[in-house]
């Protein structure tokens, strides 16, 4: 009798240990995704276009009615030969809490995205997604395919920090409030581009866009590539666009569309910084107002093929023939000549544009009679 009781207790304990070893997500409603068996790493793609009700899993939850995907410590390490590792329908809001990671792990030829928004099922990345919250998303594509990308679709970043490895391919990009996008191209990225935008870019509030391109055989590859003929760049308030010194692409910010006049960049606040191996900024027209400022430098030219609109009574434009000159050392008088800036006939390799804050006395129309005592 005692032996039977011991065997019964052993069986109960064994069953309890088996249940404990099963990941909690295995019991989550609607969860049908593979884990690595030792942690809460999800190893299969998630397609939220297929969801028909609220669902949740390890580090994520989906509100079907509002199309809201909340990420809270999710870790997805998956390969896919379809749309992307995580696909969301048009109009989805993604809320970031904590630290989140999504990786496309296939290192072979894989023409995929890490995270994309889709409207038409047959067309990738034609949808819009809004990202908010105060967390972090690390999105990485490890594919060696030149068409492999990190993010896709029209992106509105209202908050949180997104660190994207692999080209961000977007129809339009908006960064507001405290949103931060750090984009890094890989050696496999098409033409070494970090951010490829077919529409416009808007950065305001305290929003920040940083893009680092890779060296490439393309004649004028860039960290930020813009291709639309009808859109513009807009930087206002405390927003910033930065292509830092580590950029290895030939151009920092480049418009490649067929509009011969280039693309306008309206900078009324914040700062634009652009380093490029050849040009800092190319075929982008700087329209300066308010408190906006620019630092741009290139191995050959600071700015090329530009039609600027800058009131020199309100802004100071200085230059240097030195590549990567420190901003405080850029003091030379520049002259605009056919789309380029020069200093004494030599090409300006660094140009700084900023509001004129020097003391000035401005006299308006005077009326009345001025008298002195005898």
Residue ranges of predicted features:
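Positively charged n-region of N-terminal signal peptides that target proteins for export
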Residues: 1-8
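A composition-driven surface/loop motif
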Residues: 8-11, 18, 27-374
């Amino acid at each position: 009798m005692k032996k039977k009781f011991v065997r019964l207790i052993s069986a109960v304990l064994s069953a309890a240990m088996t249940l404990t070893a099963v990941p909690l997500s295995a019991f989550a409603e609607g969860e049908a995704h593979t884990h690595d068996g030792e942690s809460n790493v999800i190893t299969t793609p998630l397609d939220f276009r297929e969801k028909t009700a609220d669902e949740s899993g390890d580090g994520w939850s989906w509100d079907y009615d509002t199309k809201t995907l909340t990420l809270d410590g999710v870790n997805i390490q998956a390969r896919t030969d379809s749309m992307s590792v995580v696909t969301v329908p048009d109009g989805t809001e993604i809320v970031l809490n904590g630290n989140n990671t999504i990786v496309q792990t296939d290192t072979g030829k894989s023409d995929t995205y890490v995270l994309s928004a889709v409207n038409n099922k047959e067309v990738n990345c034609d949808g819009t997604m809004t990202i908010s919250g105060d967390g972090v998303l690390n999105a990485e594509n490890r594919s060696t395919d030149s068409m492999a990308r990190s993010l896709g679709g029209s992106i509105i970043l209202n908050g949180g920090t997104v660190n994207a490895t692999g080209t961000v391919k977007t129809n339009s990009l908006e960064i507001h409030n405290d949103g931060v996008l750090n984009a890094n191209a890989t050696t496999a990225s098409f033409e070494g581009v970090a951010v490829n935008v077919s529409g416009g870019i808007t950065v305001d509030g305290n929003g920040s866009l940083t893009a680092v391109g890779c060296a490439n055989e393309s004649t004028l590859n860039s960290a930020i590539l813009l291709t639309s003929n009808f859109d513009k760049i807009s930087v206002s308030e405390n927003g910033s666009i930065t292509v830092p010194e580590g950029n290895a692409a030939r151009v920092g910010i480049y418009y490649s569309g067929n509009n011969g006049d280039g693309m306008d960049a309206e900078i009324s606040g914040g700062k634009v910084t652009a380093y490029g191996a050849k040009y800092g900024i190319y075929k982008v027209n700087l329209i300066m107002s308010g408190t906006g400022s620019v630092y741009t430098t290139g191995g050959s030219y600071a700015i090329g093929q530009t039609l600027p609109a800058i009131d020199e009574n309100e802004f100071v434009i200085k230059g240097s023939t030195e590549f990567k000159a420190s901003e405080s050392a850029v003091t030379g008088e520049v002259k605009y000549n056919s789309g380029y800036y020069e200093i004494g006939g030599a090409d300006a390799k660094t140009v700084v544009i900023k509001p004129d804050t020097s003391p000035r006395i401005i006299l308006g129309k005077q009326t009345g009679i001025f008298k002195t005592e005898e």
